[in-house]
Protein backbone atom coordinates (compact mmCIF):
# COMPACT_ATOMS: atom_id res chain seq x y z
CA UNK A 1 0.00 0.00 0.00
CA UNK A 2 2.84 2.38 0.82
CA UNK A 3 4.41 1.72 -2.56
CA UNK A 4 1.16 2.50 -4.37
CA UNK A 5 0.69 5.65 -2.31
CA UNK A 6 4.21 6.76 -3.21
CA UNK A 7 3.65 6.13 -6.93
CA UNK A 8 0.38 8.05 -6.82
CA UNK A 9 1.97 10.95 -4.94
CA UNK A 10 4.81 11.23 -7.47
CA UNK A 11 2.36 11.01 -10.37
CA UNK A 12 0.30 13.79 -8.82
CA UNK A 13 3.47 15.83 -8.30
CA UNK A 14 4.35 15.41 -11.97
CA UNK A 15 0.89 16.59 -13.03
CA UNK A 16 1.10 19.62 -10.75
CA UNK A 17 4.57 20.36 -12.12
CA UNK A 18 3.13 20.63 -15.63
CA UNK A 19 0.91 23.44 -14.40
CA UNK A 20 4.09 25.54 -14.44
CA UNK A 21 4.61 25.46 -18.24
CA UNK A 22 0.84 25.65 -18.59
CA UNK A 23 0.70 28.99 -16.78
CA UNK A 24 3.71 30.18 -18.76
CA UNK A 25 2.00 29.42 -22.09
CA UNK A 26 -1.26 31.08 -21.00
CA UNK A 27 0.57 34.23 -19.99
CA UNK A 28 2.75 34.26 -23.11
CA UNK A 29 -0.33 33.91 -25.31
CA UNK A 30 -2.23 36.78 -23.72
CA UNK A 31 0.57 39.36 -23.65
CA UNK A 32 2.35 41.32 -26.36
CA UNK A 33 5.33 39.83 -28.18
CA UNK A 34 7.84 42.28 -26.69
CA UNK A 35 7.17 40.97 -23.16
CA UNK A 36 7.22 37.25 -23.89
CA UNK A 37 10.80 36.62 -22.80
CA UNK A 38 10.22 38.53 -19.56
CA UNK A 39 7.15 36.48 -18.61
CA UNK A 40 8.74 33.16 -19.52
CA UNK A 41 11.82 33.99 -17.46
CA UNK A 42 9.65 34.94 -14.48
CA UNK A 43 7.90 31.57 -14.61
CA UNK A 44 11.21 29.75 -14.90
CA UNK A 45 12.93 31.69 -12.15
CA UNK A 46 10.09 31.52 -9.63
CA UNK A 47 10.18 27.75 -9.98
CA UNK A 48 13.97 27.48 -9.76
CA UNK A 49 14.56 29.90 -6.88
CA UNK A 50 11.26 29.17 -5.16
CA UNK A 51 11.95 25.43 -5.10
CA UNK A 52 15.38 25.89 -3.57
CA UNK A 53 14.13 28.35 -0.96
CA UNK A 54 11.15 26.20 -0.05
CA UNK A 55 13.38 23.14 0.17
CA UNK A 56 15.84 24.81 2.54
CA UNK A 57 13.54 27.04 4.60
CA UNK A 58 9.83 26.90 3.75
CA UNK A 59 9.35 23.15 4.15
CA UNK A 60 10.55 23.26 7.76
CA UNK A 61 8.29 26.20 8.60
CA UNK A 62 5.30 24.54 6.97
CA UNK A 63 5.54 21.12 8.59
CA UNK A 64 7.37 21.82 11.83
CA UNK A 65 5.61 21.62 15.20
CA UNK A 66 3.64 24.71 16.24
CA UNK A 67 0.25 26.39 16.12
CA UNK A 68 0.94 29.53 14.11
CA UNK A 69 4.18 28.54 12.38
CA UNK A 70 6.19 25.34 12.53
CA UNK A 71 9.40 25.14 14.54
CA UNK A 72 11.83 24.66 11.66
CA UNK A 73 14.35 21.90 11.12
CA UNK A 74 16.24 23.49 8.25
CA UNK A 75 18.26 21.16 6.01
CA UNK A 76 17.21 18.18 8.16
CA UNK A 77 14.92 15.82 6.27
CA UNK A 78 15.45 13.05 8.80
CA UNK A 79 14.03 15.18 11.62
CA UNK A 80 11.15 16.34 9.42
CA UNK A 81 10.35 12.73 8.50
CA UNK A 82 9.87 11.89 12.20
CA UNK A 83 7.59 14.90 12.69
CA UNK A 84 5.41 14.32 9.62
CA UNK A 85 5.33 10.51 9.91
CA UNK A 86 2.77 9.97 7.12
CA UNK A 87 4.21 6.69 5.88
CA UNK A 88 5.54 8.25 2.68
CA UNK A 89 9.19 8.76 1.71
CA UNK A 90 10.16 12.22 2.93
CA UNK A 91 12.02 12.99 -0.31
CA UNK A 92 8.93 12.29 -2.41
CA UNK A 93 6.71 14.26 -0.04
CA UNK A 94 9.12 17.19 -0.29
CA UNK A 95 8.92 17.12 -4.10
CA UNK A 96 5.13 16.95 -3.90
CA UNK A 97 4.92 20.00 -1.64
CA UNK A 98 7.56 21.90 -3.60
CA UNK A 99 5.56 21.84 -6.84
CA UNK A 100 2.52 23.10 -4.92
CA UNK A 101 4.57 26.01 -3.62
CA UNK A 102 5.80 26.77 -7.13
CA UNK A 103 2.23 26.74 -8.43
CA UNK A 104 1.07 29.22 -5.79
CA UNK A 105 3.98 31.48 -6.71
CA UNK A 106 3.44 31.40 -10.46
CA UNK A 107 -0.30 32.15 -10.28
CA UNK A 108 0.63 35.73 -9.43
CA UNK A 109 2.79 36.21 -12.51
CA UNK A 110 -0.16 36.34 -14.90
CA UNK A 111 -2.04 38.94 -12.87
CA UNK A 112 0.95 41.28 -12.93
CA UNK A 113 2.22 40.51 -16.45
CA UNK A 114 3.80 43.44 -18.34
CA UNK A 115 3.78 45.60 -15.20
CA UNK A 116 6.47 44.17 -12.93
CA UNK A 117 10.22 44.62 -12.85
CA UNK A 118 12.11 41.35 -12.99
CA UNK A 119 14.12 42.21 -9.86
CA UNK A 120 10.99 42.99 -7.83
CA UNK A 121 9.40 39.75 -8.97
CA UNK A 122 12.40 37.90 -7.54
CA UNK A 123 11.83 39.64 -4.20
CA UNK A 124 8.20 38.52 -4.26
CA UNK A 125 9.32 34.95 -5.05
CA UNK A 126 11.49 34.93 -1.94
CA UNK A 127 8.65 36.11 0.30
CA UNK A 128 6.03 33.65 -0.93
CA UNK A 129 8.42 30.69 -0.90
CA UNK A 130 9.90 31.17 2.56
CA UNK A 131 7.11 32.97 4.44
CA UNK A 132 3.64 33.46 2.96
CA UNK A 133 2.98 30.02 1.50
CA UNK A 134 4.72 28.01 4.27
CA UNK A 135 2.94 29.86 7.09
CA UNK A 136 -0.54 29.72 5.54
CA UNK A 137 0.09 26.12 4.50
CA UNK A 138 1.13 25.22 8.04
CA UNK A 139 -2.24 26.37 9.37
CA UNK A 140 -4.06 23.87 7.15
CA UNK A 141 -1.70 21.07 6.13
CA UNK A 142 1.08 21.28 8.70
CA UNK A 143 -0.77 20.78 11.98
CA UNK A 144 -1.48 24.46 12.65
CA UNK A 145 -4.42 26.08 14.38
CA UNK A 146 -6.92 25.54 11.55
CA UNK A 147 -6.54 21.76 11.80
CA UNK A 148 -6.24 21.55 15.57
CA UNK A 149 -8.97 19.13 16.64
CA UNK A 150 -8.46 19.45 20.40
CA UNK A 151 -11.67 20.02 22.33
CA UNK A 152 -10.72 23.50 23.51
CA UNK A 153 -9.22 24.69 20.22
CA UNK A 154 -10.62 27.70 18.35
CA UNK A 155 -11.93 25.66 15.41
CA UNK A 156 -13.70 23.10 17.59
CA UNK A 157 -15.22 25.72 19.90
CA UNK A 158 -16.36 27.92 17.02
CA UNK A 159 -17.29 25.51 14.23
CA UNK A 160 -17.26 22.08 15.81
CA UNK A 161 -14.84 20.80 13.18
CA UNK A 162 -11.43 21.51 11.71
CA UNK A 163 -10.63 23.06 8.34
CA UNK A 164 -9.99 20.65 5.47
CA UNK A 165 -8.36 21.36 2.12
CA UNK A 166 -7.96 18.14 0.19
CA UNK A 167 -6.24 19.36 -2.98
CA UNK A 168 -5.03 22.92 -2.52
CA UNK A 169 -8.03 25.06 -3.42
CA UNK A 170 -7.25 27.30 -0.44
CA UNK A 171 -3.64 26.56 0.44
CA UNK A 172 -2.43 26.93 -3.15
CA UNK A 173 -4.94 28.66 -5.40
CA UNK A 174 -6.62 30.98 -2.91
CA UNK A 175 -3.29 32.13 -1.47
CA UNK A 176 -1.89 32.75 -4.95
CA UNK A 177 -5.12 34.41 -6.05
CA UNK A 178 -5.29 36.84 -3.12
CA UNK A 179 -1.66 37.84 -3.64
CA UNK A 180 -2.39 38.32 -7.34
CA UNK A 181 -5.39 40.52 -6.52
CA UNK A 182 -3.36 42.71 -4.17
CA UNK A 183 -0.52 42.96 -6.69
CA UNK A 184 -2.85 43.90 -9.55
CA UNK A 185 -4.61 46.50 -7.38
CA UNK A 186 -1.32 48.11 -6.38
CA UNK A 187 0.17 48.11 -9.88
CA UNK A 188 -2.97 49.24 -11.68
CA UNK A 189 -3.69 48.74 -15.39
CA UNK A 190 -1.07 48.28 -18.07
CA UNK A 191 0.32 51.41 -19.71
CA UNK A 192 -1.91 52.28 -22.66
CA UNK A 193 -4.91 50.32 -21.39
CA UNK A 194 -6.97 53.51 -20.96
CA UNK A 195 -7.00 56.57 -23.16
CA UNK A 196 -7.10 60.18 -22.00
CA UNK A 197 -10.89 60.05 -22.23
CA UNK A 198 -10.94 57.15 -19.77
CA UNK A 199 -12.14 54.61 -22.30
CA UNK A 200 -10.67 51.13 -22.25
CA UNK A 201 -8.44 50.08 -25.13
CA UNK A 202 -8.07 46.51 -26.27
CA UNK A 203 -4.55 45.11 -25.93
CA UNK A 204 -4.64 41.91 -27.98
CA UNK A 205 -2.40 39.04 -27.03
CA UNK A 206 0.10 37.60 -29.43
CA UNK A 207 -1.29 34.06 -29.73
CA UNK A 208 -4.57 32.49 -28.66
CA UNK A 209 -3.06 29.15 -29.69
CA UNK A 210 -0.48 29.38 -26.91
CA UNK A 211 -3.09 30.56 -24.43
What positions do the PLM features span?
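Hydrophobic alpha-helical transmembrane bundles of multi-pass membrane proteins
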Residues: 1-211
Amino acid sequence: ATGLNTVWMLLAAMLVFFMQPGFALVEAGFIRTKNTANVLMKNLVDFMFGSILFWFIGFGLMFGIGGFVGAPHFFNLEAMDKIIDNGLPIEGFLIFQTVFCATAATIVSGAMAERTKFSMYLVYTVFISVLIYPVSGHWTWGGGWLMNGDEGSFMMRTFGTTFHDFAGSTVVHSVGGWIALVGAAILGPRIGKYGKDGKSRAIPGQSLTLA
